[in-house]
Amino acid sequence: MVNIPSYVFTVVKRLESSGFQAYLAGGCVRDSIMNIAPNDYDITTNARPEEIKNVFRDFKLILTGEKHGTVAVITNGGIIEITSYRLEKGYTDGRHPDNVEFTSSLIEDLRRRDFTVNAMAYGIHDGLIDPFNGRDDICLLYTSPSPRDKRQS
């Protein structure tokens, strides 16, 4: 279902071979289900930022999101954001959480996401993980034609 580019697969396998869970999450899963080529790939993991940095110590890293649990890994294929499973509280700026608490639960991490269609994960061994029925809700994203289109029919 999700076509995983080799550079993304390599990052997932490296996390797993280091003893961590690793799942594609969010928009890349949603887009793949909708038969849209993802623009980027995000990975969610039970590894904490320090552990992610250690696993990818031989890669160039972007650490601007580290306090929110995100470490970006620069690969030959592109930049992959790896984010620790987390819980969030408060959004004073409307975009970034005021408080982040790491968790060991993939389901808790998915629960914090904005929409059910973004609260899905995909594991290379487990396939689709969809605890909130986001796949069923994808049909809600499709809209009817605009009034202009209807008049031209």
Segments the model singles out, each with a brief description of its role:
Residues 1-151:
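Catalytic cores of the polymerase beta-like nucleotidyltransferase superfamily
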